């Protein structure tokens, strides 16, 4: 993963403008009273690069980071059972708090991929979890 991808999402390494990192500490979500500095960078121009970054991480070994989606790996080994896979991802990425409707939608979609294709099932499920709006808001 090159610096270009992190620059594209507005967070170049070692380039934070303040001690608050990249997030404006006083950012309030529009039309609410909710203080949410982490959403100060979220806009229509940053959403696609963030999705691209998630896809890149899922499919490439980068900077010593490798996510193992093979059948022998921690995600792929659960891929034959779409429900078990999504529950496992929900535990890891959402602290076991994945909404039921989100879980159902992901299980249904992942179930369309043949159970014999553990790598595709696992990487698809992980991508759907980490790019969901619920993941961004809750975790």
Functional labels for PLM-detected ranges:
Residues 1-139:
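Flexible, low-complexity segments enriched for small/polar residues
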């Amino acid at each position: 993963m090159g610096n270009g991808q992190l620059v594209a999402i507005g967070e170049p390494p070692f380039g934070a403008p303040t001690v608050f990192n990249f997030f404006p500490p006083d950012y309030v979500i529009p039309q609410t009273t909710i203080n949410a500095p982490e959403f100060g960078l979220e806009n229509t121009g940053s959403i696609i690069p963030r999705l691209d970054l998630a896809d890149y991480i899922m499919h490439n070994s980068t900077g010593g980071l490798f996510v193992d989606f093979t059948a022998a790996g921690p995600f792929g080994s659960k891929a034959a059972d779409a429900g078990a896979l999504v529950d496992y991802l929900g535990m890891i990425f959402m602290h076991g708090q994945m909404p039921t409707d989100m879980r159902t939608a992901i299980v249904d979609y992942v179930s369309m991929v043949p159970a014999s294709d553990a790598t595709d099932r696992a990487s698809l499920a992980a991508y759907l979890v980490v790019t969901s709006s619920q993941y961004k808001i809750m975790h």
